[in-house]
Structure formats: C-alpha cells, structure tokens
C-alpha cells in the first residue's frame, strides 16, 4: 500500500509514476491512499486509478462554503463540490472519505457541516469507512488539530466548549 500526501496531484511526476506502475503490470496488486483537498483532481488521474487494486481518496475539507474558504484559503467551494460529486461517481475500486481537522475555527459548526453533507445524498462517500470500521464513518471522518496550537480547539474557553458540546448533543438527537 502506498500513502500519498502533501499535494500529490500537483506533481507531474506522480502521474508518470502511476503510468509506469501500470505499464509494468503491478497496478492490480497495489492499493493507493491519498490525502488531498482534491481541487486538482483530473479525469486522467481517475482513469489511471481504475487500473489499481484499490484507491482510498481522503478529501480534506474543514467546513462548508465561506468557512472552508477562510480555513483553507483560497479554496473555491464550487470546485470542492464538483470534486465531491465526481468522486461519488467513480468505479468501485475508488473509495472516498471527507476528512475534517477539528480546530478552534470549525468545531462549533461541525454539526451544521454534517447536516450539509447528509443533505447531499452521496452514494458512496464515507460509506466504505462505515462498513470497514463499524463506527465513525457515514458522514465524515475527524481528527484533532494540535499544531499550530493557536488553532487547536483546546484553546477555546470552557464556556465555548460547553456550547459546542450542546450543539453536538442537539445534532445527535436530530
């Protein structure tokens, strides 16, 4: 398995690397895993991925619309949505997960983001993760941001943490 991070879709050599693996006949034995915001995803890359045993594409999104633009400047929300809908319609060997870095800038709004994701009625995004792990998947996957410390949710005042907790409890009942 190959885990590919740090802007793999920006690197021209990456596509050539995948083409070389395919030409040598190894692709059907190799699983790939990507972490990316996905905005540079091309049809050519998806075409190459169909040759591989499995591709897990983790899309880094931390909020919806304007909040995502603020956190992941200069992300264009329309581009993000286009990528998500394209990934939701890929062959079965390609699975997709929305990955959220929980932080001070988005923690309070994650229940709203979850409602937004659910409203999209994705057919396959995060579905494989739900089946594999029996928990955590289904809407999006989360991990905590610790560095830089000034963005960590741990810096929030206790009153803010309680308000956020209440929003999550309300969402749980939703």
Q: Model regions: which residues?
A:
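Eukaryote-biased activation of long, low-complexity terminal tails and linkers
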Residues: 1, 17-18, 22-23, 28, ...
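Core AdoMet radical
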Residues: 1, 5-12, 24-43, 50-82, ...
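Distinct, well-ordered alpha-helical segments
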Residues: 13-19, 43-49, 109-111
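Alpha-helical packing segments of well-folded alpha/beta enzyme cores
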Residues: 17, 80-83, 113
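Hydrophobic positions in alpha-helices of CheY-like receiver
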Residues: 21, 84-87, 91, 117
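Acidic (Asp/Glu)-rich catalytic clusters
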Residues: 47-54, 88-91, 121
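Catalytic cores of alpha/beta
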Residues: 104-121
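C-terminal accessory regions of radical SAM enzymes
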Residues: 119-174
């Amino acid at each position: 398995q190959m885990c590919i991070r740090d802007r793999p879709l920006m690197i021209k050599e990456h596509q050539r690397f995948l083409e070389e693996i395919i030409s040598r006949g190894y692709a059907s034995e190799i699983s790939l895993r990507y972490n990316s915001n996905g905005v540079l995803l091309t049809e050519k890359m998806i075409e190459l991925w169909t040759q591989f045993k499995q591709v897990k594409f983790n899309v880094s999104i931390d909020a919806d619309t304007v909040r995502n633009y603020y956190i992941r400047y200069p992300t264009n929300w329309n581009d993000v949505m286009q990528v998500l809908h394209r990934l939701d319609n890929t062959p079965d060997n390609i699975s997709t997960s929305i990955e959220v870095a929980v932080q001070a800038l988005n923690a309070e709004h994650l229940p709203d983001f979850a409602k937004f994701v659910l409203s999209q009625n994705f057919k396959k995004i995060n579905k494989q993760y739900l089946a594999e792990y029996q928990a955590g998947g289904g809407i999006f996957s989360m991990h905590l941001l610790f560095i830089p410390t000034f963005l960590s949710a741990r810096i929030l005042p206790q009153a803010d943490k309680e308000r956020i907790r209440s929003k999550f409890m309300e969402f749980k009942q939703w």
